[in-house]
Amino acid sequence: MNRLEGNVALITGGSRGIGAAVALRLAEEGADVVLTYEKSSERATEVVEQIKAGGRRALAIQADCAVPEALTAAVDEAAAMFGRLDILVNNAGVFLVGPLEDLGPAEVERTLAVNIRAPFAAAQAAVRHMGQGGRIISIGSNVAERAVFPGLALYSMSKTALVGMTKGLARELGPRGVTVNLVHPGPTDTDANPADGPNAETIAGFTAVGRYAEAAEIAATVAHLASADGGYITGASINVDGGFTA
């Protein structure tokens, strides 16, 4: 299936976990892919090589998403390298949690910079290169709707902010043919949150299906939203969480 043939996609934080799965899935669907990474250069290279082996073009760009200038430069470089930009996936994020009194200014600033300001800055930069059929998709979290453990206030706040951003951008960019959506993954088996981790059984128990998601399952929803099949979906927050929020 080549639903994304001829499209160029940029995935922030695309070297690992859900971001890497999204990069690989969009490439499988026919897109050329640019991904950003902060530190995982080896993993980023592995993803790029996998994409190239499948016959698509790919590029990895080092960028700290907390620095707006670096993120904007990455967006512009992606568009310049491949001649266009059709799809932006805001995936990069930080997960800083703990008791309220233990979260200092540094943790708050880092969370706001990466989880809120970066998606907004990336959208600002990307939309300059997008035409009819452009797609902006952000990766949120199920805890934007259901925070089942204490200590999640800062992270939950940052992901909830994406709901407002998504709705506002969808209304603004709809007349330009650009859709904007938000995907809220539930517990997903990644190196940061493995399905065999110490609290995994408890976390999986909060889902209706009793298990973690595979990263590829989250990527499948992103691919649908990025394709023409998702053209009438905009301003939506979609829970891909195994019934965690049911």
Please annotate each region the language model reported.
Residues 174, 179, 233-235:
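Short, small/polar-rich loop/turn modules that mediate ligand/substrate recognition or access, typified
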